[in-house]
Regions:
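Dynamic "connector" segments at or just before major functional cores
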Residues: 1-209, 213-228, 396, 421-431
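An anionic, glycine-rich sequence signature occurring as long contiguous blocks
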Residues: 2-23, 257-363, 370
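Short amphipathic alpha-helical "interface-anchor" segments enriched in bulky aromatics
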Residues: 40, 88, 344-375, 380, ...
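Structural motif
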Residues: 60-69, 321, 372-382, 408
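Acidic/histidine-rich, metal-coordinating catalytic segments
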Residues: 163, 231-242
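Short, surface-exposed basic-aromatic patches at helix termini and helix-loop junctions that form
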Residues: 248-257
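A short, flexible helix-boundary coil/loop motif
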Residues: 391-431
Length: 431
């Protein structure tokens, strides 16, 4: 049987130039897979809108490097595995990066590390050298808009996952505090996802409650979603770090359902004493992990005005595993008719574990590179990593369906596709 292998691939033209990728094109530029990201960006219109979230105080007739070019440099660089500004001292000379950044004159280099550094350090104040700043509300709104645009029709129901993680610090950055749980100096960013879509990435100091600021972010996101999809049903899902009376009260008042982890205590353990005994007996008979589920109404005791004002439904898992008790609890606004206790815990609550994979992908895109002096600059670095994630996940969603990379992590996509040095790109010399 005759087998035909396509020898070249045509991409969106770059001004008057054709862009063609071949597997025998020499060594002019070896990041040929990055053109797939360029195609994805043109579908999403991501980087143009992201660049529009910056305020440029420079004299426009004396500008050598536009904001869009510099923003594109940083985002594409992170997506392709170039985490350091020093990397751009070489990348700026690569004609393919010129194509990615949208530069028309490919014989001229892109911005160097010092110029890119000034892009990060702008604080909105009058400064001779740092005249660019970014508008956080605009970036936040863009993330939600990308999520909304990914759906041709409004879904009936969505689940918002909320979580936090630690970004270790090794210098004297602004907002640096020691966190006992993580046993290190760190930032404590707040992430909110819906499936693979990142809706919020808020940098925070680690000297506050894990849920600090979460209500404001949820209210903002829910408001924007309901403006576009007024009939959508929304469920908020998070661990016990977000089980706060203020947040649950707001959800109940706004018609947002929730399922949140509930930290165990002696009162809760006593309530499920019979189920815990049954689970232990099953383990004694079989030697296998055993689970017994229960549900009940529960209200915390008020302490320093932090208790619950009302009873709420709690689902419990009485588990005995490896010779030890392992009780777990979740509090929810969902009824038992909608979600019986076992299904609520196993099928709905435990599915939040997938968000941990999405957070790991942020680290694959260098979200932990927060070594700038100010929190504002480090928030921008976090945004750069998030935009790189949106770009690669967009490629995964739009371009890799029904392929072996359809469910791959972004690091795998980078290694197997974006950084495949067998794909060379040439032909940058003429019109």
């Amino acid at each position: 049987m005759t087998q035909c292998t396509q020898s070249n691939f045509e991409f969106q033209a770059h001004f008057s130039r054709d862009v063609v990728a071949r597997f025998d094109g020499g060594t002019i530029s070896s990041e040929g897979g990055s053109l797939l990201l360029r195609q994805t960006d043109q579908r999403l219109n991501l980087l143009t809108r992201f660049g529009g979230c910056f305020l440029d105080g420079r004299e426009q007739d004396r500008i050598e490097h536009s904001i869009l070019e510099m923003v594109s440099q940083r985002v594409y660089g992170l997506a392709l595995g170039y985490e350091d500004l020093n990397d751009h001292e070489q990348l700026r000379k690569d004609p393919l990066f010129g194509v990615l950044a949208g530069r028309e004159e490919l014989d001229k280099p892109l911005a160097g590390k010092s110029t890119l550094n000034r892009l990060e350090l702008g604080n909105g104040q009058r400064d001779r050298y740092k005249k660019i700043t970014f508008w956080k509300p605009g970036v936040d709104e863009l993330l939600v808009n990308v999520f909304l645009e990914a759906h041709p029709q409004p879904p009936e129901q969505i689940i918002l996952d909320i979580d936090t993680t630690d970004l270790p610090l090794h210098g004297k950055q602004e907002g640096r505090f020691f966190h006992g749980y993580y046993d290190s100096y760190c930032y404590l960013p707040l992430y909110i996802f819906c499936g693979e879509h990142v809706l919020c990435a808020r940098l925070r100091s680690s000297n506050s409650d894990a849920a600090a600021g979460s209500l404001a972010e949820i209210a903002r996101i829910v408001g924007q979603i309901r403006t576009a999809w007024p009939a959508v049903k929304i469920i908020l899902r998070g661990d016990s770090g977000f089980c706060r009376n203020e947040l649950m009260n707001w959800c109940e008042g706004q018609g947002v359902d929730y399922v949140l982890g509930l930290a165990r205590n002696q009162r809760l353990r006593k309530i499920i004493g019979r189920q815990m005994w049954e689970a232990t007996e099953q383990w004694n008979r079989t030697g296998q992990p055993s689970r017994v589920f229960a549900e009940f109404r529960y209200q915390t005791r008020k302490a320093k005005n932090r208790g619950w004002e009302r009873e709420r439904r709690v689902a419990a898992k009485a588990e005995h595993i490896d010779g030890k008790e392992n009780p777990r609890f979740v509090v929810t606004s969902l009824s038992k008719e909608q979600w019986p206790a076992q299904e609520l815990y196993e099928a709905l609550y435990c599915a939040r574990g997938d968000m941990e994979n999405r957070i790991k992908e942020q680290f694959s895109l260098f979200a932990d590179r927060v070594s700038a002096e100010t929190m504002r600059a480090n928030q921008l670095r976090l945004y750069f990593s998030v935009m790189a994630y949106v770009l690669v996940s967009g490629l995964r969603r739009l371009g890799l369906k029904a392929t072996e990379l359809a469910q791959a992590q972004v690091s795998t996509i980078r290694t197997k596709l974006l950084n495949d040095h067998r794909l060379k790109v040439g032909g940058f010399g003429g019109d």
